[in-house]
Design a protein with these regions (language model features):
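Short, solvent-exposed loop/turn segments at the edges of secondary structure
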Residues: 36-37, 164
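ATP-dependent small-molecule kinase catalytic core of the GHMP/sugar-kinase superfamily
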Residues: 2-8, 14-29, 52, 61-63, ...
Length: 178
């Protein structure tokens, strides 16, 4: 079995930065964005005796024993962070697999590539483990993994744009509601 997932990168059109804490909690925020025909891809092949992370766009790979995936640092922090959270949140037993990712634009490009990668990887794991996650669940969980588990800075528009795609107007309120 091969599981494939992809999520679109986004172009911010207006309101960028108003989705970032603490601004959005104090004043609220609103953004306008559109997804474009550039993507983050994730492919999972279950099985084997070790876990392999491969980032084709960075020409990097890391092989580890399945029970030692925990610890989310370096080039594979997003992929490992998503896996760690999925295993712990849904009470799953770690299993060996190969995860290959590719992003059409590098981190720091301003297109939400890191968050889009988180959404694509989460989508692939959700499919593999048949997790009961809807679109809002995926966007919220991807945001929580990046901001709280991994300590990455940023707002919320990237995860929601990558999950829903298309042309988006989003409002953010002090209670965390999108």
């Amino acid at each position: 079995m091969i599981i494939r997932s992809k999520a679109p990168l986004r172009l911010g059109l207006a309101g960028g930065g108003t989705d970032v804490s603490p601004y959005s909690e104090i004043f609220g925020g609103a953004v306008l964005n559109a997804t474009i025909n550039l993507y983050a891809y994730a492919t999972i092949i279950p099985g084997g005796d070790k876990t392999l992370f491969r980032a084709e766009d960075k020409n990097e790979a890391m092989e580890i024993a399945s029970e030692t995936v925990h610890g989310s640092t370096g080039s594979f922090s997003i992929a490992k962070g998503v896996y760690d959270r999925v295993i712990s949140e849904f009470g799953l037993k770690p299993a060996p697999f190969s995860l290959t990712t590719y992003v059409d634009a590098p981190a720091g490009s301003g297109l939400g590539s890191s968050s889009t990668l988180a959404v694509a990887v989460l989508g692939a794991f959700a499919e593999w483990f048949r997790l009961p996650l809807g679109e809002y669940d995926i966007a919220r969980l991807a945001w929580d993994i990046e901001r709280n588990d991994l300590g990455m800075a940023g707002g919320k528009q990237d995860q929601y744009a990558a999950t829903f795609g298309g042309f988006n107007f989003m409002e953010f309120s002090g209670n965390g509601k999108v």
